[in-house]
């Protein structure tokens, strides 16, 4: 009886040791004997030597991208836009997505900093691409459309990694100060010309209004 009890205890211990469970924050993919098995909820037996597992983080990653100064976005009308945008991305609880993330990203999904390195360049490129097709005024007046286009391009750019965008938010938008424009840059020189013309036109308009007001007051007197 003692031997039977001991054998049962050993078997229970081994089963407990060999059985791996997923959690809400971490799924895993088992490969090796019997092929691939994706475990999002529940668990699976993982046998040493004949099985390998890759953990996949399921948490939402928030990434803030700030473009300002010489890194600001160049718009369709050759203006420069300073922008702060927040991206929220994660691996969806879908077997195909988890499998893809395990293959392309591996354990980097568990490290927010490594994951940021993977996606931030793609997100920045999406911002630049959309900005290049809209004027500064259009971005300001159609923020929702701008975010929608950025989301579409950014989501497509990370789709092959198993990641998916949850949301994109534009936190702030402003024109880059004129001092930040580089006259030696073709795009900046065009933008500077437009800004200078606009500034001079506004000065002339203010001066005309001031003069008209002055004349009107003198005539009344």
Give the positions of each predicted feature.
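Elongated, amphipathic alpha-helices that form coiled-coils and helical stalk/scaffold elements used
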Residues: 61-221
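Domain-core and long-helix interface of multi-subunit machines
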Residues: 1-65, 117
């Amino acid at each position: 009886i003692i031997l039977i009890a001991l054998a049962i205890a050993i078997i229970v211990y081994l089963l407990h040791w060999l059985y791996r469970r997923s959690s809400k924050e971490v799924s895993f993919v088992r490969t090796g004997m019997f092929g691939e098995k994706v475990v999002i909820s529940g668990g699976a037996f993982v046998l040493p030597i004949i099985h390998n597992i890759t953990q996949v983080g399921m948490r939402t990653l928030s990434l803030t991208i700030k473009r300002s100064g010489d890194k600001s976005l160049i718009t369709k009308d050759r203006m420069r836009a300073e922008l702060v945008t927040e991206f929220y991305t994660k691996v969806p609880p879908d077997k195909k997505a988890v499998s893809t993330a395990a293959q392309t990203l591996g354990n980097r999904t568990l490290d927010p900093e490594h994951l940021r390195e993977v996606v931030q360049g793609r997100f920045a490129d999406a911002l630049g691409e959309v900005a290049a097709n809209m004027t500064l005024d259009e971005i300001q007046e159609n923020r929702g459309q701008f975010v929608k286009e950025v989301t579409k391009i950014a989501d497509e750019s990370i789709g092959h990694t198993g990641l998916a965008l949850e949301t994109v938010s534009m936190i702030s938008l402003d024109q880059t100060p004129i001092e930040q424009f580089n006259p030696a840059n073709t795009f900046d020189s065009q933008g500077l010309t437009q800004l200078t013309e606009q500034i001079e036109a506004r000065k002339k308009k203010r001066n005309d209004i001031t003069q008209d007001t002055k004349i009107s007051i003198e005539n009344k007197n």
